[in-house]
Amino acid sequence: LHGALNGDHRTVGNTITTCQQALALFFQPDIRQRCIPSPERPATDIADVINRGGTFYLLGREDPYASASPLMTALAEHILDTALVLANASQWGRLCPPLLACLDELPSTAPLPTLRTRMANERALGISFLYAAQTWRQLAAIFGEQEARALFGLTNVLVVFGGSKDVGFNKEVSDLAGTVRIARTSWQTGQR
C-alpha cells in the first residue's frame, strides 16, 4: 500500500481513484451507520446463520456514483469463506445441509473474483453455485473474455432465455446443443 500511494504519480492516482470508487458507498452517513453494529442491532453471526440453514439476501442496484457492488462482493466473499471453513471443519468433510449461492445479476451486483476457483473446488464440499447474467457480453466485460469462458466451462447447466442478440454466443450455444432430428408424419386424403 505504501508503494502504491507514494510511487509514480499515475499509479498513485489510479490507486486513489479505485479506493474512492470502492468506498464511495460509505461517504453517505446513513449507509455507513447501518454497517456499524450496535447494542440494538448486533452484528450478524454468519456461521450461525449457515449452520441453521438460514438465508442471506444481498440486495442492491448498480449506481455509478455510489455503487453497493464492492460492499456486496466483499460480504458475499466473506459468507462463502465462512461456509468453506465450516465445510472443512465438518465431521462429514462438507456442509450438511449444503449451501446454495444464488448469484442473480452477478456482473452488476457482486462480481466475485474467486468464483471460478470456488466453482471448481467447493462443489464437493457442499457449496453450490447458481449465477445469472443478462448477456454473455456483460459477463465478459466484468470478468474478461478468458475468465468468462472458464466460468462457462465450469457451468453444469446452461439456461438461455429468449432475446439474446449476440450472434456469436447464440451460435456457440446452438453448436453445444447439436443437431436435432425431428420426425414428421404427413397424410394425404387424395382430395385437392
Locate predicted features:
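P-loop NTPase motor core of the ASCE superfamily
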Residues: 45, 53-54, 117-120, 138-192
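A generic structural motif
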Residues: 86-93, 131-134, 184-191
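P-loop NTPase motor domains
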Residues: 1-127
